[in-house]
């Protein structure tokens, strides 16, 4: 067996290499969201991290041997990404994980679920409390798992289908999602809050999907953002606003109480077509802005709500 000094050196070198690879791997996946391209990586994360760790340790031990020694000693190495395989990887493989298919399906379904609540006359003001409760629960779980590796492994096995690899050892993007919606549903009218949610649910998904597939064919407009992704957000934003204001608001007018719907064709200088086009522009702009490197799940509903409220308010006769 290797002596304690050699073991510590090998362990330190391996963990350093694995973390360095994990960061590069996460950054390359993040950059591919809209540009459709990423840094080529040889092998799986675990294989590449093993190679880096072995090289960093001077080849004095292999990953398998190091793990055996650490297990014998009872050491728990907290490795980012490389030691935890997400459910989407286990069930569908790396392609589905890379393109975040389960996450996008869930992301989009929230918009349809919210629309169903709207037509069933669920008071939008009652949505805030469940959102706040959900935020507190997810935050507590994240704090626990980020300080308890064993629980983190179990957590990722259960919810990993909806997680990004970079979230394995960082706070969950759901926190930002909930925080953005809490802001929108707390300070804006019913229609503005709902539209901001639709733009987050559908436009962000469209931008990510189209950007990954065709972003390399169009110019980049900012870091990790492509023209293809922004155009997709614009088109879906136009459709979302047109369908909501053009069909659902008048068809289900009985679920709207006085003052809840801010835009009215009789009191606004904006027609439905103009409002929808501006809604698409808001979606594209909110999705494309990189605000202090904050999470899109927070900036999109917040900026969308602010922009839509401002547009509708200034267009009143």
UniProtKB/Swiss-Prot annotation:
Domain of life: Eukaryota
Membrane-topology descriptor: Multi-pass membrane protein
The protein's enzyme class: transferase
PANTHER family, per the entry: CTP-DEPENDENT DIACYLGLYCEROL KINASE 1
Presence of keyword Calcium: yes
Principal place of residence: endoplasmic reticulum
GO molecular function: ATP-dependent diacylglycerol kinase activity; CTP-dependent diacylglycerol kinase activity; lipid kinase activity
Cytoplasmic side, ranges: 152-167, 212-230, 293
Pfam families with a match to the protein in the record: CTP_transf_1 (PF01148)
A cellular component term, taken from the record's GO annotations: endoplasmic reticulum membrane
GO BP: any one term: phosphatidic acid biosynthetic process
Lumenal-side segments: 1-130, 189-190, 252-271, 315-317
Function: CTP-dependent diacylglycerol kinase that catalyzes the phosphorylation of diacylglycerol (DAG) to phosphatidate (PA). Controls phosphatidate levels at the nuclear envelope. May be involved in vesicle trafficking between the endoplasmic reticulum and the Golgi apparatus.
Residues annotated as transmembrane: 131-151, 168-188, 191-211, 231-251, 272-292, 294-314
Biased composition (Low complexity): 23-38
Span list, region Disordered: 1-44
UniProt catalytic activity: a 1,2-diacyl-sn-glycerol + CTP = a 1,2-diacyl-sn-glycero-3-phosphate + CDP + H(+)
Name of this protein: CTP-dependent diacylglycerol kinase 1
Compartment(s): Endoplasmic reticulum membrane; Nucleus membrane
Similarity field: Belongs to the DGK1 family.
Keyword terms: Calcium, Endoplasmic reticulum, ER-Golgi transport, Kinase, Magnesium, Membrane, Nucleus, Transferase, Transmembrane, Transmembrane helix, Transport
Key word Magnesium present: yes
Enzyme Commission number(s): 2.7.1.174
